[in-house]
């Protein structure tokens, strides 16, 4: 039961009839037996307008009679320093020590011999 002072606020639905798309489940051939498996293809400029630009990671939730696609937010850009540290991790132990010594000299913690 509603309160006597409550007023229903009209709202506009996020999904309007203009945003609806009609698709048909097609099929794709599966190698090596070439059996037909269900396939859904989505393409069009409307995908980018909806937040699904090329390269966007997508979370897929599957329920009976319903598939929900959600665009994942882009990962934060890694700083140039962190990218450099990742490169240093790939170096030999000797070169890693040299980088550590260089950082110590730059930071003023060590004296140059």
Curated annotation (Swiss-Prot):
Residues 29-74 form the SpoVT-AbrB domain. Keywords: Cytoplasm, DNA-binding, Endonuclease, Hydrolase, Nuclease, RNA-binding. Its EC number is 3.1.-.-. Its main location: cytoplasm. The keyword RNA-binding applies. Involved in the degradation and recycling of damaged RNA. It is itself a target for degradation by the ATP-dependent protease Lon. This is Endoribonuclease SymE. It comes from Escherichia coli O1:K1 / APEC.
